[in-house]
Amino acid sequence: VASQNQWVYDLENLTYAIVKTRCEKKLKTKYPKLKFTQEEQSDSATASFPTVLVQALEPIEQNEDLEGRRTNTVLFTAQVIVTTNKSRSEALNVAQTVADEYKAMSFKLAPAPFARKNGKLWTATLRARRSFDWNDRL
């Protein structure tokens, strides 16, 4: 029997799957080695660039029922880190495409995509935040 709060536990994987599918359709032609992941470390011996790491950051319950059993609203934040060995513009282009997909699902960006260089790698980071109610549809 699924928990009445299962929708909360499924948010990370559901939003990841939607963003991954939509972005791959838009980016795979330009970036054939594009890799989306939820894992911070790859088992692969060779890196694939650009890589898009998507993870939830502390989903916060905002509205429970009077008995405290059911979660009615959750503030959900996804952090996205795009890593590439090519250029700042490549990192930002991929991150901006991901950001647009979150915006299409009514997320707010805080921060919007920004890029930094560390050694030979460029990273672009963004966070997307949105409240979800138990009966919201994506």
Task: Identify the meaning behind each predicted range.
Residues 64-72, 117-119:
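Short, solvent-exposed beta-strand/turn "edge" segments of beta-rich domains on protein surfaces
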Residues 93-138:
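Acidic-leaning, charged glycine-interspersed low-complexity segments
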Residues 86-87, 94:
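Long, charged/polar, surface-exposed segments that mediate recognition or autoinhibition
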Residues 56-59, 71-77, 97-101:
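Short, low-complexity, polar/charged sequence segments that are solvent-exposed and flexible
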